[in-house]
Amino acid sequence: SRGLGDVYKRQPYDRIETDFKMIRDAGMNVIRIAESTWSTWEPEEGVFDFTHLHRMLDCAAKYELNVIVGTPTYAVPSWLAKKYPDILAVTHNGKELYGHRQNMDITNPDYLHHAQIIIEKLMEQVKDYDCVIGFQLDNETKPYDTCSKYAQAKFVEYLKNEFPDIDEFNREFGLDYWSNRVDDWDAFPDIRGTINMSLDAEYKKFQRKLVTDFFAWQADIVKKYKRDDQFITHNFDFEWHDYSYGMQPEVNQYEAAKCMDIAGCDIYHPSQSSLSGREITACGNIARGIKGDNYLVLETEAAGNHPWLPYPGQLRLQAISHIANGACMVEYWHWHSIHNAIESYWKGVLSHDLRPNRLYKECSVIGNELKKYGHRLVNLKKTNRFAVIADNASLTGLNEFKLNNESDSNYNTVFRWLCDALYLMNIEYDVIPADPALFASYENILVPALYSATDDVLNALNEFVANGGNMVVTFKSAFSDEHLKIRHDVQPYIINKALGMQYDEFTLPDNVTVSCGGKSSKARDWMEMVDCTTATPVAMYEHKHWGVHAAITENSYGKGRAMYLATLFGEDTLIEALKLFFGEQKNEFDASYPVVIKRGTNTQGEKIIYLLNYSDDEQTVTCHADGLKKLCDDSTVSAGDCIALAPWDFSILYAD
């Protein structure tokens, strides 16, 4: 059913009854507890005290609140770090010190031994509570750049399994360069010293596998205790650019989630006049793509960081936007603003005075609205015609070989460039891995900077176009193989056939302009000197010397078409190029941003349409379809009717 809730942390004084009653009265029905509480449950080795846990669970049952219990393993107690100093990770930057969270070596056997004990002890305490609906594994887990003796020994075994022939390993990674050759696995050098980007990228891939294995290990422990009606999840997060931005570089979320029942995520974003809905959509689509299904928002801001205090109405719009994107739950980090330590100014629903306030009242509006019609919004299913590929290996590749050393632009910059353009065009899209088995499910695929790819993936993209698909590919695609070895053939490798273009020169733009559809913008960060073979130039570089080369091309190949974007340029120009390629994407309201349209089918088989106003001004849209009704009052909306949307407001329509 509907889910709106909070992460509950202990207070500076006892008010659990007051808090849980307030949570219930606000229409919230879920709390998340127990993560980062290891030292509370086990204040010294072998001494356990779950008094506060039972008080929370008993009170949750009293107020009919559902509970998600987190395993408390992402913050280690001081006694554990003192007894086993090697638990603190050794990284590229040296040895970690005790104090902050997520500073441990997740391959350390002493850490894993004691983590298993506390997980099992916790599970024994909670297994008989009906109010516990699920379990969260750890918290925003990463490998924490562990380069310990345990991790590096596992890496060598991983390589030996991948490359039984050590000579093949040396050839594949180009280790004869700079006298880096390895001829004895037992003499494998410390990975922290490598200058070989292929080897470094392989270690990062291995570190992602450590996270996958860590989750599978925890899930196996939890499964010994969980009931069939309980779920296992995790709060996956994203690359951080002062807020959630794009694909997480340190976790292969597709693989990591295989041991889970439902994917969860933490999405934070700008607010006030900067609230655009972009992060809710881009990161939410990543989350929905992790298991190809609905997901849980296990954390998002109520107030959060200083600039994020929402305008009136924005909190409600944000919650509905998550649900419109396929989320089945929206939880706030956190219930109340805390009074000590590093996140003292990461504001919760309640401020430091713990009194009902504006945000609490707005949460109450959301919660009580969802009581009425949440059952018709939850588990929204989408059938999107567009997909954007997100690829861990390519992300790593562009971290190893930056686009521009003078810029912060990276893989996620290119990923979000395409995603945000689709969003502003009111085109809903899925985010998928570079898995050929998924390509045929879509009519249109966008490929941002697929720097690292196998022959099979590239041939599958050619086949997708040949069979009638439409494909947009950006610069820095098909440049290296899966181990970051640069291809020694025409670039972009293999897919130049579908694209009908090629290049062998590239540089950084210097006063270069790209124009399309009446919009012009400066090229930035990277440009390729593209020559058309069978493609038609859509836009040439506007430059005295580089004007002979194409910046945007379009090609017919088999039954389909392909566009290539040879440089990074302004959003308005990109939107014009995509309109030219895909055609105008009409909707039944002819609405354009800042009115965002999302849609799907609910469990009852009704078509649900969301009209979301992401602006500080009233917006009016005209309906061009019959047979629609407003969810709030069942009033009919017919062709020609106008719907007014107040600032930061929304309307939900349905059709049988």
Question: Across the structure, where does each feature detected by a protein language model lie?
Answer:
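Aromatic-lined substrate-binding rim segments of carbohydrate-active enzymes
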Residues: 17-24, 32-92, 218-225
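Short, well-ordered coil/turn segments that N-cap beta-strands
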Residues: 2, 27-29, 61-67, 128-133, ...
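Short, small-residue-biased leader/transition segments that mark boundaries at the very start
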Residues: 1-8
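Aromatic- and glycine-enriched glycan-recognition loops and surfaces
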Residues: 10-24, 44-58, 117, 210-217, ...
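Short, acidic/polar
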Residues: 10-23, 244-256, 311-319
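Carbohydrate-binding surfaces of carbohydrate-active enzymes
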Residues: 185-188, 216, 224, 228, ...
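Polysaccharide-binding and catalytic clefts of secreted carbohydrate-active enzymes
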Residues: 92-262, 266-273, 277-280
